[in-house]
Design a protein with these regions (language model features):
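Electropositive
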Residues: 1-108
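Conserved beta-structured recognition patch
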Residues: 87-136
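Charged, low-complexity, helix-prone segments enriched in Lys/Glu/Asp/Gln
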Residues: 61-66, 73, 121-134, 158, ...
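A structural motif
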Residues: 40-41, 135-138
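Short, polar loop/linker segments at the starts of domains and inter-domain junctions
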Residues: 42-52, 120-128, 180-190
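Mature, structured domains enriched in cysteine- and short glycine motifs
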Residues: 112-117, 138-190
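Short alpha-helical interface elements
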Residues: 54, 93, 97, 126, ...
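Bulky hydrophobic/aromatic "packing anchor" residues in well-ordered structure
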Residues: 29, 105, 129, 175-176
Length: 190
């Protein structure tokens, strides 16, 4: 498997572009999945139902991309290839300044585990993010694979009400239950 090194452009919350290598290479972060760029999540604190037709939208795809972009900055990135995805894109373990990018995305709550082989550290980061309601774990969000199957309009002009309607007919939900939504987070270190 190839190793990629150099400056990157962040395409979305899990995909990097090494534009200076050959004709350019897309590389996907191993072990995680994030919202697609046009995907919306919804704020569970929907109190004024008489005035507001749907909960406040949260652009989870752009937020995931922004966090990854902030983490990478303009520092060089190293990705060690592990496999190829079904679409032929290399899946790799990527680091910037010694920071594991997939672990960072899980730690801040803008990614979820997406691998049959669970890394114990990744699992701990995701569990802590869920408990503290970081990132997408503080919203109602449709499972990414289900969103990819059901969403008809996948353009960046997509309206949040479309994802509100998809959530109403969801088969699986990755959002944690909000019975304890009024409780303070277990962690306060962020």
């Amino acid at each position: 498997m190839p190793t990629f090194k150099g400056p990157v452009t962040v395409l979305d919350g899990r995909t990097l572009w090494f534009g200076t290598l050959g004709n350019g290479y897309k590389v996907r972060l191993a072990g995680i999945d994030t919202c697609e760029l046009p995907q919306w999540a919804l704020n569970p604190k929907w109190t004024n139902r008489d005035k507001q037709q749907a909960p406040t939208p949260v652009p989870c795809g752009p937020f995931a991309k922004a966090w990854l972009k902030r983490t990478v900055g303009n520092r060089p990135t190293t990705c060690v290839g592990l496999a190829y995805a079904n679409d032929g894109i290399p899946v790799a373990q990527c680091t910037t300044n010694g920071v594991d990018l997939a672990a960072e995305m899980l730690r801040v709550g803008w990614a979820r585990l997406d691998s049959p082989y669970i890394n114990a550290q990744y699992y701990a980061y995701q569990t802590n993010a869920m408990a503290a309601r970081y990132g997408m774990w503080g919203t109602y969000v449709l499972d990414m694979n289900e969103w990819r199957r059901k969403a008809v309009d996948k353009t960046l002009d997509r309206h949040p009400i479309a994802d509100f309607n998809l959530l109403a007919e969801r088969k699986s939900e990755i959002s944690p239950p909000f019975a304890d939504a009024r409780n303070k987070p277990k962690r306060t270190d962020r």
